[in-house]
Amino acid sequence: MGSQWTAWRVAAKAPESEVITSFHLVPEDHGDWRAFKPGQFLTLRLGAEDEQALTQPLIRYYSLSGSPLQQDAYRISVKREGAGSIHLHDRVQVGDVLQVQGPRGAFVLDQASHRPVVLLSGGVGLTPMVSMMHALAPTGRTAFFIHACESAGVHAFRQEVNALVQGRPHLHAHYVYRQARPEDLANGHCHSAGLISRALLQSLLPLDDYEAYLCGPPGFMQANYALLRELGLAKERIAYEFFGPATVLEEAAATVAAPPSAMPVTAAMQAEAAPAEAPSETATGGQPVVRFATSALERAWTSDDKNLLDFAEACGLNPSFSCRAGVCGSCSTRLLSGQVRYTEEPLEPPAEGHVLLCCAQPCGPVTLDL
C-alpha cells in the first residue's frame, strides 16, 4: 500500500473496554492488503467518509492490534480521546469506508532474534504489544507482557491475552492496576496494585539477556525506561513508541547525552561533509538562506522562525505534516544540501538524507526538495 490512500471498509466495530474500541477493516480491493510486522501502524484520513462531521479531514495514526498471521483484514484499537479518535468512536459505523495508508513504522518486534522479550505497556499503549503477543505465541520464544492501567474498566484485551498465554509456558502476562479493588486481585483481573516498580520487575523477570519494548504515555515511558536502565538493560536493547511529544528518554535515566542542538544532521549523513557553497549563502544580516528547490523559492531564515515546517508554510508552501512534534514522520523531506539541528529529538530518525521539518532548524544555508 505504501504512501497511496486506499479504501477499507469497516467490517466490525467492537468495544474492548470502557474507553477503547476496535475497528476491523477489510480492503475494498483485495489487492491492497499487505502483510504487516507486529508493532506497525496504519495512517487514516478521517472525515472524507462523513463530510458533515469535520470541517477538514484529519490524519491520524493507529497501531495494528491484531495478529500479523491473519490475512485480508486489519484491526486497530482506538481510545476515545482527541478529535480523530472521538470521530471514529461516534461517527464511523460498520459499512463505512475509510481512507488508509500503511502499514508502516520501525517499532517492530525483532522476529529474527531468539532473546527473551519484555513487553511493557501503559493504557492504550498495549495495542502493538497484543499484536506482538500473537506473533510470539507459536514461536516458543520466552516473553513477559507487563501491562499497567487505571482499573478493570479500562483494561482492554485481558481475555484475549489470557487465551494466548494459556497452555503456552513460554508466555507470561502480568497486569498492574493503579486503582485496583480487592475483587480485581481476588479474581485475577490484575496481579498487582499501584505502579510498575523495580521490585516488581525483579520479582517477575529471571536474570537473562532481554530485549524490551515499551509503549505508553510519556510519564509511563520515562519511568519504565529508567527502571530498565537501572536493572542493567542496555539502551540498544530497548525499543519504544509513544503517542505524545518526542522526548529523549535517556534523560530520565540520568544519562549524560549531547543535547539535540549539538547533533547536526548532514544532507547525506556522511562522515566527510561537502564543501559549503560560496555564493548567496547568507542574506543581509548574516541569516542563512533556505532554498526550496522544487518550488524555485529561497528566503532568509530569521531568529524568530521556529522550525522549517512553519517557515515553509509562511513561504506559501504546503508540505505534508500531522503531529508537528517529531513523532509521525509525515513531514520527512529530502535535504539536498546543508545541515540542520533538531530542537526536539525525533521519535524515529528519518531516512538517510532526509529531515523532519517540524522540529528542525538550519545550521546554515540549506536546500530542501520541496
Language-model segments: residues:
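Ferredoxin-reductase
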Residues: M1-V97, C149-S151, N162, R178-A180
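FNR/FR-type flavoprotein reductase catalytic core
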Residues: A83-R291
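Local cysteine-cluster metal-coordination motifs and their immediate loop/turn environment
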Residues: P128, E313-Q339, A351-G364
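Short proline/glycine-enriched turn/loop segments at secondary-structure junctions
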Residues: R229, E345-P349, L357-C359
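C-terminal accessory/binding modules appended to enzymatic or scaffolding proteins
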Residues: E281-R324
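Short hydrophobic/aromatic patches at helix-to-coil boundaries
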Residues: T367-L370
